[in-house]
């Protein structure tokens, strides 16, 4: 039987909502662990301890650790996609992405660094990359040649991924403003020869 404290945690929460809330708590704990710069062991027990939930609740949402790690990565990627989709200009996109992935670096480390240390995410990272490229392609929709459009989008996603990874690893020595300005200029300079300036925002 659950303790009074544990029962109190869900007091007033409809039964149908409790599973979703517990899953959200577990995902949030997974982001913190997977994105920690100290790289603690991401075990089911560690996740449950971080989320203050028992393992029984873990297994009501996830079949095993691998499924959970993929779900954590998918959650961060989805947040990143949603953030970029709502941006109207290159500067807004970069600023929003920095707020999401650098100001809260655990998310950035999950997105950019975790696939290199979690074998289960190798495939997930490869599967998500085309989504980011396609999103950028849509932002460059006025480019007439779809092949050229895709090459530009692919080169920008690759270049920006490398920049954000280096920034998260504190390898650039750039201030936040310098970093944002450089990323914005990179977007403009790469696309400018092919897109009329009004289309660049």
Question: PLM features: what roles do these ranges have?
Answer:
Residues 28, 88-106, 150, 154, ...:
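Amphipathic alpha-helical segments that line or abut small-molecule/effector binding pockets
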Residues 83-87, 111-115, 140, 167-171:
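Secondary-structure edge/capping motif, primarily at the C-terminal ends of alpha-helices
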Residues 119-161, 177, 185-188:
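Amphipathic alpha-helical packing segments from all-alpha helical-bundle domains
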Residues 20-31, 35, 40-44, 49-52, ...:
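An amphipathic alpha-helix adjacent to DNA-recognition modules
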Residues 1-7, 138, 169-201:
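C-terminal peripheral helix-coil segments that are non-catalytic and often amphipathic
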Residues 5-17, 47-68, 103, 108:
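Basic/polar phosphate-binding segments, predominantly the helix-turn-helix DNA-binding elements
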Residues 43, 109-112, 175-176, 199:
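Short, hydrophobic secondary-structure boundary micro-motifs
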Residues 100-126, 133, 137, 165:
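Amphipathic alpha-helical segments used for helix-helix packing
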């Amino acid at each position: 039987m659950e303790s009074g404290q544990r029962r109190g945690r869900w007091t007033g929460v409809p039964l149908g909502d409790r599973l979703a809330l517990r899953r959200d708590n577990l995902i949030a704990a997974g982001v913190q662990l997977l994105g920690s710069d100290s790289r603690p062991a991401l075990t089911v027990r560690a996740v449950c301890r971080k989320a203050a939930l028992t393992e029984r609740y873990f297994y009501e949402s996830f079949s095993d650790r691998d499924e959970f790690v993929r779900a954590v990565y998918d959650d961060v990627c989805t947040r990143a996609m949603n953030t970029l989709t709502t941006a109207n200009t290159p500067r807004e996109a970069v600023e929003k992405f920095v707020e999401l992935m650098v100001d809260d670096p655990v998310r950035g480390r999950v997105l950019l660094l975790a696939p290199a240390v979690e074998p289960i995410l190798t495939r997930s990272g490869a599967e998500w990359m085309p989504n980011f490229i396609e999103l950028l392609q849509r932002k460059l929709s006025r480019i007439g040649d779809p092949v050229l459009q895709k090459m530009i989008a692919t080169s920008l996603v690759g270049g920006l991924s490398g920049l954000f990874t280096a920034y998260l690893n504190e390898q650039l020595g750039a201030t936040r403003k310098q970093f944002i300005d450089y990323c914005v200029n990179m977007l403009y300079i790469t696309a400018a020869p092919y897109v009329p300036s009004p289309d660049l925002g």
